[in-house]
């Protein structure tokens, strides 16, 4: 199974945000253990680098993001994906549209996000982290 993990779920882990941390961490563990193939959109990296600025030094941010890149694969954004996202009028948020473009490119089964409502017109179904874990908890056992 392939999942694209949205920036907000990654931020939950990196910032230790309650009450989301445990669930997000479990999903990353599934990726690290190769029980699920995890992906993130390339533009999530500069977004996370910025989001983490108040809680980590620049060096800490670099290291933690390199660690994340060892767990999930980074899907790049090229001009084709950008133009396709710009042409897509079904999304209110351009960044979400780019997430969807990356999910399509990696043939993801789901976009794991805390903002599933923002992906109602997505070609790839969005699922909340807790719903994903509930649905696929048997994967954790193997």
Where are these regions (language model features)?
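A general alpha-helix detector
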Residues: 9, 47-48, 84
């Amino acid at each position: 199974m392939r999942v694209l993990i949205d920036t907000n779920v990654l931020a939950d882990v990196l910032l230790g945000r309650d009450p989301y941390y445990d669930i997000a961490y479990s999903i990353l563990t599934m990726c690290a253990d190769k029980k699920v193939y995890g992906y993130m959109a390339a533009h999530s990296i500069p977004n996370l680098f910025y989001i983490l600025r108040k809680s980590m030094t620049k060096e800490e941010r670099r290291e933690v993001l390199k660690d994340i890149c060892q767990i999930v694969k980074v899907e790049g954004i090229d001009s084709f994906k950008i133009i396709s996202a710009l042409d897509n009028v079904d999304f209110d948020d351009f960044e979400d549209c780019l997430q969807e473009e990356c999910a399509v490119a990696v043939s993801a089964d789901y976009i794991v996000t805390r903002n599933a409502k923002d992906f109602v017109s997505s070609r790839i179904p969005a699922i909340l982290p807790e719903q994903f874990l509930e649905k696929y908890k048997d994967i954790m056992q193997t």
